[in-house]
């Protein structure tokens, strides 16, 4: 797959990145280099290789999945200018 200037501009637009005409050429080259590397990765034979999440053999610590309120509501609103029943009070912004 090859990236052309139109694709570079479209990607920049989708990413909300301003790209000048001078930057399009170098970006096109960089994106094509990235895609070429990804194509090389696709050629690697991974048959029989187990998926892994880390390069070191470690287990994730597990804990019980318990729902609670955190017990810190009063600490959280302690520095708020105005509160009521552990809720932040803010000025009305919509009529």
Curated annotation (Swiss-Prot):
BP GO terms, sorted: glutaminyl-tRNAGln biosynthesis via transamidation; regulation of translational fidelity; translation
Entry EC number(s): 6.3.5.-
Catalytic reaction equation(s): L-glutamyl-tRNA(Gln) + L-glutamine + ATP + H2O = L-glutaminyl-tRNA(Gln) + L-glutamate + ADP + phosphate + H(+); L-aspartyl-tRNA(Asn) + L-glutamine + ATP + H2O = L-asparaginyl-tRNA(Asn) + L-glutamate + ADP + phosphate + 2 H(+)
Keyword RNA-binding: no
Signal sequence annotation: none
Coiled coil, from the record: none
Enzyme class: ligase
SUPFAM superfamilies in alphabetical order: Glu-tRNAGln amidotransferase C subunit (SSF141000)
Xref: Gene3D superfamilies: Glu-tRNAGln amidotransferase C subunit, N-terminal domain
GO terms, molecular function: asparaginyl-tRNA synthase (glutamine-hydrolyzing) activity; ATP binding; glutaminyl-tRNA synthase (glutamine-hydrolyzing) activity
Alphabetical UniProt keywords: ATP-binding, Ligase, Nucleotide-binding, Protein biosynthesis
Entry function: Allows the formation of correctly charged Asn-tRNA(Asn) or Gln-tRNA(Gln) through the transamidation of misacylated Asp-tRNA(Asn) or Glu-tRNA(Gln) in organisms which lack either or both of asparaginyl-tRNA or glutaminyl-tRNA synthetases. The reaction takes place in the presence of glutamine and ATP through an activated phospho-Asp-tRNA(Asn) or phospho-Glu-tRNA(Gln).
Description of how the protein assembles with itself and partners: Heterotrimer of A, B and C subunits.
The family this protein is said to belong to: Belongs to the GatC family.
Record-given protein name: Aspartyl/glutamyl-tRNA(Asn/Gln) amidotransferase subunit C
Encoding gene, per UniProt annotation: gatC
């Amino acid at each position: 797959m090859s990236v052309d200037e139109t694709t570079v501009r479209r990607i920049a637009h989708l990413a909300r990145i301003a790209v000048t005409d001078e930057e399009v050429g170098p970006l096109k080259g960089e994106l094509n280099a990235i895609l070429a590397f990804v194509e090389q990765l696709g050629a690697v034979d991974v048959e029989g290789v187990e998926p892994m999440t880390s390069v070191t053999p470690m287990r994730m610590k597990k804990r019980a999945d318990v729902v609670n309120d955190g017990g810190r509501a009063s600490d959280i609103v302690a520095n708020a200018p105005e509160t009521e029943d552990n809720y932040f009070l803010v000025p009305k912004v919509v009529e």
